[in-house]
Amino acid sequence: MSSNVVETIQPVAAAIVSAHQFELVDLEFVREGQSWYLRLYIDKPGGINIEECAMVSDELSEKLDAMEPDPIPQAYFLEVSSPGAERPLKKEADFQNAIGKYVHVGLYQKLDGKKIFEGDLTAVTPTTLTIDYLDKTRHKTVTINREQISQARLAVKF
C-alpha cells in the first residue's frame, strides 16, 4: 500500500517542490506504531528553512485534500523537512555530488568482513562506489557494487 501512495503522490509533490526551485530529496509513506506518516525531504543550495518547509506542507496538504479519489484514505501525519546533515544518497546526482565527502554505506551482505563502510567517497560509476576508509589505523579502499548497497547517506565525521 505505501508504494502505491508514494507513486500517486510523488508527481504532485515534485511539481510543488520544483515550482519553488527546491529539490525533492525523498518521499516516504510509513507506519510507525499505530500512526501513518507521509514524509517529504526537501532541499535547495544553501539549505532549506522552516518557513519554506511550512509553505510546501501547506500547498501539498491543500492539493491532497482536493484529490479524488483520496490517495490516502486513512489518517496520517504530513511532515516536510530538510534531509539534514546525514542526507540520504538515492539518485545518481546525489552520489555525484557526494564525491569527496564523508559517507556511510550499509550493505545487504558482508564485503571484506564488513556490512558498513564509512569513509570518503572517491569515485562513482553507474554500477559502483569507491570509498577510502580507515580500518583501525590503516587507510584502505573498497569498491562496492551498487546492487549490494542497502542504504547510503552523507555522514558526519567525528
Swiss-Prot record:
Protein's name in the database = Ribosome maturation factor RimP
- Identify the keywords attached in UniProt to this record, alphabetized: Cytoplasm, Ribosome biogenesis
Carries keyword Cytoplasm?
Answer: yes
Offer one example of a GO biological process linked to this entry. ribosomal small subunit assembly
Reply yes or no: does the keyword Cytoplasm apply: yes
> What Pfam families does the database record attribute to this sequence?
DUF150_C (PF17384), RimP_N (PF02576)
Lineage of origin: Bacteria, Bacillati, Bacillota, Bacilli, Lactobacillales
Its main subcellular localisation, reduced to a broad class, is cytoplasm
Family affiliation: Belongs to the RimP family.
Q: What does this protein do?
A: Required for maturation of 30S ribosomal subunits.
The subcellular localization recorded is:
Cytoplasm
